A protein has these predicted regions:
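Broad gene-expression machinery/nucleic-acid interaction feature
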Residues: 73, 118, 167
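Cysteine-cluster motifs in flexible loop/terminal segments that predominantly coordinate metals
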Residues: 29, 33, 156-178
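Short, intrinsically disordered, charge-biased short linear motifs at domain edges
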Residues: 13-16, 148-161
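Nucleic-acid nuclease catalytic cores
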Residues: 79-153, 174
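Active-site metal-binding core of divalent-cation-utilizing nuclease and nuclease-like domains
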Residues: 46-82, 95-98, 131-134
Length: 178
């Protein structure tokens, strides 16, 4: 998606970079992605936020956790022979598509840095693991989503709230329904 020229003219000088959690949020709720782009903090007392962090911290103990590289925050990284494997840990496969696009974003950005990797989605509570390889079609999807997010971030106001099945558990719910 092309970045809207009018929006770009009026944009602040420094846009925050698109990050993986923003891609995930955008798939679920564009308003949440906009709030994240403004560095508005979610409700830190949210039970689901705590549970997700706990699962991530306590699962896969032997693997290298939370590796930061430029604007990327990778949950797990390991080597399998000559291949770098980047994994994203999620509480549930209920948001599988959002998690898949988040991981695809990481693979896309790593490829742009000259780092070849493959991905794994990990759902420890379900004892599931899914492989992900960045192909041309998936790379185009990532580019399109990045463009949509940039256009969203350029907006002065967030999109109006739209109720979906994730609202009840969302740590940003107070910003929509209070």
């Amino acid at each position: 998606m092309e970045i809207d020229a009018k929006l770009q003219e009026t944009a602040p000088l420094h846009l925050p970079p698109v990050v993986g959690s923003m891609v995930n949020a955008y798939i679920i709720c564009p308003r949440k992605a906009w709030l994240m782009s403004r560095q508005i903090c979610p409700d830190e007392d949210n039970t689901h936020l705590h549970l997700g962090r706990l699962i991530q911290d306590q699962s896969y103990g032997r693997e290298r956790k939370e590796v930061r590289l430029e604007h990327l925050c990778l949950d797990l990284v390991r080597r399998e022979k000559e291949t770098l494997v980047v994994a994203e840990v999620k509480k549930s496969s209920r948001v599988r598509e959002a998690a898949r696009m988040q991981l695809a974003f990481y693979l896309y950005e790593l490829e742009r840095m000259g780092i070849e990797a493959r991905g794994e989605l990990l759902f420890p509570e379900e004892r599931r693991r899914e492989q992900l390889v960045l192909d041309e079609k998936l790379a185009r999807q990532v580019e399109e989503i990045k463009g949509c997010i940039v256009n969203l971030v350029l907006q002065e106001q967030p999109p109006p709230p739209q109720r979906n099945t994730f609202c009840n558990k969302c740590a940003y719910a107070e910003f929509c329904w209070a």
